[in-house]
Amino acid sequence: MNIKGSPWKGSLLLLLVSNLLLCQNVAPLPICPGGAARCQVTLRDLFDRAVVLSHYIHNLSSEMFSEFDKRYTHGRGFITRAINSCHTSSLPTPEDKEQAQQMNQKDFLSLIVSILRSWNEPLYHLVTEVRGMEEAPEAILSKAVEIEEQTKRLLEGMELIVSQVHPETKENEIYPVWTGLPSLQMADEESRLSAYYNLLHCLRRDSHKIDNYLKLLKCRIIHNNNC
């Protein structure tokens, strides 16, 4: 197929470069380099960049969870306590692809934005608390810092997408509130590590959901479900 001069060329090159950066664990390009107020990026490119960025965040979240699991939780059985205890569990998220495909497009976009907003505070405190740990593992801290920064960028990108797809939509500030800071500051090491494990487990879970949801939405909105 000759892509010279076709509208696919820019998107294809962007995805190729972004995939190379992901393989090298380098942050993807900004969703809108000029900032939201002066954004001239097309809807197709906004989705391309959001999908690449969400996948990058999920990869980092998975790596950070694995690092923490290996270093701190061997044989402690934290996983049994982490099930269904995420602060975003109250959100009505689709459980499989079929449910996701049946979800109203506007509600789907709003759901992704709500999940991203609900992670602003826990990610900020995660970075702050890990920095304060004795002998804070650099591999975990650096990933936490990067995830916090890139999640803000992804949220900005999603708000731009919503403004293009549904310009009549008013900003929705309703999202689940995280109340787990006291648990991260407990004096008892077992309880504190369990709280960290739960938070990282939930982050990995939610970043995976967003990654999948964005791919489905891109297929629906940009390619008219022809994927």
Swiss-Prot record:
In alphabetical order, the GO MF annotations are: hormone activity; prolactin receptor binding
Annotated signal sequence is 1-28
Q: Give coiled-coil spans as residue ranges.
A: none
Q: Where in the cell is it found?
A: Secreted
Q: Report the record's Gene Ontology biological process terms.
A: cell surface receptor signaling pathway; female pregnancy; lactation; mammary gland development; positive regulation of lactation; positive regulation of receptor signaling pathway via JAK-STAT; response to nutrient levels
| Glycosylation site positions | N59
Q: Note whether Phosphoprotein occurs among the keywords.
A: yes
- Residues found modified as Phosphoserine: S54, S62, S118
Identify one Gene Ontology CC term for this UniProt entry: extracellular space
Name the cystine pairs.
C32-C39, C86-C202, C219-C227
For whether the record's keyword set contains Glycoprotein, the answer is: yes
Q: Write out the entry's keywords from A to Z.
A: Disulfide bond, Glycoprotein, Hormone, Lactation, Phosphoprotein, Secreted, Signal
Q: What is its main location?
A: secreted
Assembly and oligomerization:
Interacts with PRLR.
According to its UniProt entry, the function of this protein is described as: Prolactin acts primarily on the mammary gland by promoting lactation.
Q: Which family is this protein grouped under?
A: Belongs to the somatotropin/prolactin family.
Q: What is this protein called?
A: Prolactin
Q: Which gene encodes it?
A: PRL
